[in-house]
Amino acid sequence: MKEQITIYYDKDKKHPNDYIIKRVITPDGDKYSIMSYYKIFGMVKRFHSKIELSNVAVNKYILQCMKSQFFNRVEYQKVMEGI
């Protein structure tokens, strides 16, 4: 089992076909990586960020995301690792 942090966003009513769905922050050793999921023209696309964050930077990043007008919630989850 590995831990991950998921930040969910509400749908943008002005642009219902183009909006961010969620960001998933996963630990990779002592750094964290970010995977973003967007809905673009009705299709879900996944983008892996090349940015590696420290523990303190992750906390600041979550606080920054919470300031978004489309922010919904943050979930701390334990998920099974890929087989």
Which sequence ranges carry the predicted segments?
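Short N-terminal "domain-start" leader segments
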Residues: 1-33
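Generic structural motif
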Residues: 12, 24, 37-40, 56
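Short aromatic-glycine-(Arg/Gly/Cys) micro-motifs in beta-strand/loop hairpins
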Residues: 29-43
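Mixed-charge, Lys/Arg-enriched low-complexity segments
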Residues: 42-83
